[in-house]
């Protein structure tokens, strides 16, 4: 079982995720024809991309598969492949490896006769395959009780001014979401109108770590605004905030849990 992927698509993925983590977990769902890429950033922050299987990302297998990919190592070695290469990614779960392979054929004039010359490249990279994550992505899309749009650069400017604090209080009032620093002295507050806000939600307040919000800084060059949702599970437990956007050709989700 392997994934065949165009090198341009692989470059997008590894360039993006290597800014946040040295490795990611890849989950291929052959039934839904989707590939999920997941990384845990710490501090109750998870990031994942959802990529449809297509001509540029093709799965050669019938069963679902989960494996780890060392994105930092892959990013460093992609210069070994031709710019038009289609790369096979084949995990070796038993030996804690992942293999990248590709070939390229060029025609060379040899005594006025074109001769095909084939170049094969294979790279084996070590990575612990025993700790792959099976992440329930659908859990965070089951229910939404609040929705707004947040301009990333303005949010980053706001939290830069409050770096002396450890968390923000999240409140809801008059169909607005309010982010406020603790106390009344030297207090900062940011308010967003919401396109969706349940009446039940406006009875609660939560806390979110500023260190978690700071992890959005890695998106600064790629994202202008995030669709932001307050998400619940099927038992109506409010889980946290889900930031979503489409980056290049794939969808990105970042989930941040509210503090207890």
Swiss-Prot record:
Q: Which UniProt keywords apply?
A: Activator, Transcription, Transcription regulation
The record's InterPro entries line, in alphabetical order, gives: Pox_TAP
**Flavoprotein keyword on record:** no
Tell me, using the record's free text, what induces this protein: Expressed in the intermediate phase of the viral replicative cycle.
Give the function comment from the record.
Associates with RNA polymerase to initiate transcription from late gene promoters.
Please give the Pfam families that the UniProt record associates with this protein: Pox_TAP
Give the top-rank taxon of the lineage listed in the UniProt record for this protein.
Answer: Viruses
Organism, by scientific name, is Variola virus (isolate Human/India/Ind3/1967) (VARV)
User: What cystine pairs are annotated?
Assistant: none
The protein's name: Late transcription factor 1
Q: Name one GO biological process term.
A: regulation of DNA-templated transcription
Keyword Transcription regulation attributed: yes
- Describe the protein's quaternary organization and the partners it interacts with: Interacts with the late transcription factors VLTF-2 and VLTF-3. Interacts with the late transcription elongation factor VLTF-4. Interacts with itself.
Family per record: Belongs to the chordopoxvirinae VLTF-1 family.
